[in-house]
Regions:
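S-adenosylmethionine
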Residues: 1-380
Length: 380
């Protein structure tokens, strides 16, 4: 909306440094209370006169004094793509998938500031550690997810060194949970970096062991295996996060899943090539996390949707064979576009009749859930 306002009020496109100045100044004018707006404008005009020129200061003064009125007119005109800084083609796709009313709600929430959530591992040791940090958090409606109170990052950050806590949106929990991982099982997480969903899978395995200790042997948890795969410069962060899991066997494998032979790499590392469950957190358009990644809305193109959908289909077809008979394949994205999500799940099911879709769900954003996306589980 700010860029649109500058376009309306400037007779010609300002130079880059003037664009940067105007964006910052207009943003401050917008959020200022009405009785403080004149002071904010005068401050920016004075700064421009001192650091640019008198003529440019006059230009800034003219733009800032008219920007609030221009923005209000834009809002009344219901130009959604301008108001919410979301490409019009994407808004039209959402209207097609979800209807106008639900799309309006999505747009509203995606433009609100993101929250920071800490996820706590589900065991008593984690709870005891957290007792010393509760004052820095607020509870959420999601079990084991706690919202960090503003201004408390420095106070809360030591939790991340313990191995019991991880920063992630509550929505990230839903897809890994569909694997229903069990202690003693073997699981494969593809496109795993930075490791948030691998950490969830590991905690789910641990929770199963703790909840059903009487039916497992003492060594069952340690015998569980989770192999997390990614490649290139994404590997180091994945390793750092998975090294904090000390209660079961976690391996990290460097493999370009579209270009290299994963089976060969697994065998070379002495790892199995058949798993009780495979999780694919596929590359996607990121349309479900525009609240968390606001820059993505300026980069995304409509062609990206189809390109991502094609990559996702290739991953599904290529790695379904790593699931044991009776096992589960979970496909997940952080997109809310049907072409990348339900259509891909249906495509896979149609072309692989020995697989059955057990769940297929799109998660839309809400006030307490920054992230959203899609997951589907298919059983062999």
């Amino acid at each position: 909306m700010i860029e649109h306002t500058i376009q309306l009020l400037a007779k010609k496109k300002p130079k880059f440094r003037m664009q940067c100045l105007l964006k910052a100044a207009i943003a401050e004018v917008i959020i200022a209370e009405d009785d403080k707006k004149p002071k904010v404008i005068d401050s920016w005009v004075g700064w421009t006169k001192k650091n640019f020129s008198k003529g440019e200061a006059n230009f800034v003064n003219a733009v800032l004094r008219r920007c609030s009125e221009t923005i209000e007119k834009t809002k009344r005109s219901e130009e959604l793509s301008v108001i919410y800084s979301i490409p019009n083609w994407l808004i039209e796709r959402w209207k097609k998938f979800f209807g106008s009313s639900k799309t309006d709600g999505i747009l509203e929430i995606l433009n609100k500031p993101s929250e920071v959530f800490f996820r706590m591992s589900p065991d008593s040791a984690a709870a005891r550690v957290f007792e010393n940090y509760t004052q820095f958090f607020s509870p959420s409606k999601f079990e084991n997810f706690y919202r960090l109170n503003s201004g408390n990052w420095k106070n809360a950050s030591p939790l991340l060194e313990t191995g019991y806590f991880y920063i992630q949106d509550p929505s990230t929990y839903f897809a890994p949970n569909q694997l229903k991982p069990r202690a003693g099982g073997k699981y494969l997480d593809l496109c795993a970096s930075p490791g948030g969903k691998s950490r969830i899978i590991a905690d789910l395995i641990k929770n199963d062991f703790l909840q059903n200790r009487e039916k497992y042997g003492a060594e069952t948890l340690e015998e569980s295996l989770l192999v997390s795969v990614d490649f290139g410069n994404r590997i180091q962060r994945l390793k750092e996060n998975m090294e904090k899991v000390d209660f079961m066997d976690c391996k990290v494998v460097d493999c370009n899943l579209l270009k290299e032979d994963l089976k060969q790499k697994l065998e070379a590392a002495g790892l199995p090539t058949a798993f009780d469950g495979v999780f694919i957190d596929a590359p996607c358009s990121n349309t479900g996390v525009l609240r968390r990644r606001p820059d993505a809305r300026y980069r995304i193109r409509e062609s990206d949707i189809s390109n991502c959908a094609e990559i996702q289909r290739k991953l599904l077809e290529k790695y379904a064979g790593y699931v044991k008979s009776g096992g589960t394949l979970v496909f997940s994205t952080c997109s809310i576009d049907e072409e990348e999500n339900a259509q891909n799940a249906e495509y896979f099911s149609k072309n692989n009749p020995d697989w059955t879709i057990t769940v297929s769900k799109t998660i839309l954003p809400d006030e307490e859930n920054d992230g959203c996306g899609f997951f589907a589980a298919v059983r062999k």
